[in-house]
Amino acid sequence: LKIIHTADFHFREKDYFEIKKCVDFIVDYAFKNPPDLFVISGDITDSRFLDLDTRSSRAIFTIVNQMLDLAPVAIVCGTYSHEGKSPLALRSCRGRFPILVSDLPEQYGYVSGQDDVDVFRGEWMTLEEIQRDDFVPSFIISQIPQPTKQYFVNQLSILDTDKAISTAMDSIFTSFGSVVDEFDSIPHIVNGHGQIGGAFISETQQLIGVDIEVSKAQLMSLNADLVCYGHIHKAQAMGDGIFYAGSPTRMNHGETEDKGFYEHTIYGITDSYGKYISINPDLRSNFIKTPAIYLHNAKLDNTKDGCHAPGVDIMDTIKMICDVVSIDHDEWGIKITITAWQDEAKNINQAEIERVVLDLGAERVKVSIIRKPRETVRSEKVLEADTLPDKLIAMAEMRGETVQESILEKARMVEAG
């Protein structure tokens, strides 16, 4: 069973061409290497207010229709503040295979066609329907959209606390896992969106939970052969068959990790109809890179000594940075943040920097200047002073004044209590 797992397209008009280039790459790969299932783990759009009559919206529908001509597609709604329930509109997409879009936790089985007329088609069915009609699904999928406090309060009538919600999530996961146990030797895939404890957002920084977070232990209670998740833009294998696909494009300058999608393969023994008789616990997962533009983040502090090499000005430093970036990356962009003294910032020509960088081969460039008052530096002496009298003296020196001894004496008395 081959699954293409992707997420976090974040389609938006300002980055339309870059996003479409990378998502088209996924579809082109699928045409050459047809999967048995597409799993899209949320955040297809960057805003639920994206107009349907935009090139981004049209691209989303076209891409999903193309996928549906190759394999069934399972989608969960992602971050509510981003796309809300807008993916539900994709239920209208049509192809040779059916689509499943979920905004609530639910389980479905995919029953493929078995006769000559229906050989390329199948149907998503609830597990209750499958058991009632005695069907044998090709695989089972548990859809876990990003959990929201509003959902649990409205649906479960429990207190709006993270602890209570975590308990409710435990109940859902355990229940889903128990139901799947009744389908022996049927591959079980989880498609989810949200925050998993221990996930990394960069090489060194762990994600800190600020909303509802699920643990690996909770996910393992689902008894799944594969857990596909979205929300974190850094692709990663978390162990125990749990994966974040990451985003197919770089969302921000400074994202240095590779971008792409996963191709997972679940192995097992099947009958003449392709139904699984037994499942091999070994899972093979390949990360396939997309041609995402490299977005470098350069920070120059003109207020500090050693910002540039001796005899080198700011423009030469920027050129050297661009030369290094262009050696390793064919397609690249750069964000340059320059910190300068407020009285010297006027000497920095942003338009000229942008022109030079584009001439050096950048696809895009953004230059911003942080203006730093010199008084800010002088006031650091006040902050560094240990005692109240010392702070008064430092403040007076900054203003070119002197402090009367009587005031200093009162300061000593105040500090002494």
Regions found by a protein language model. Give the residues of each.
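Divalent metal-coordination and catalytic microenvironments
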Residues: 8, 38, 43, 60-63, ...
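Active-site environment of divalent metal-dependent phosphoester hydrolases
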Residues: 12-14, 46-49, 76-90, 108-111, ...
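Core catalytic region of metal-dependent phosphoesterases/phosphodiesterases
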Residues: 14-116, 121-126, 130, 216-224
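Short, solvent-exposed loop/turn segments at secondary-structure boundaries
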Residues: 14-19, 49-54, 155, 202-204, ...
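Extreme N-terminal starter segment of soluble prokaryotic enzymes
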Residues: 1-4
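Conserved catalytic scaffold of divalent metal-dependent phosphoesterases
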Residues: 88-212
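Conserved beta-sheet core of the metallophosphoesterase superfamily
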Residues: 95, 196-198, 202-270
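Accessory, non-catalytic peripheral segments of nucleic-acid enzymes
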Residues: 267-417
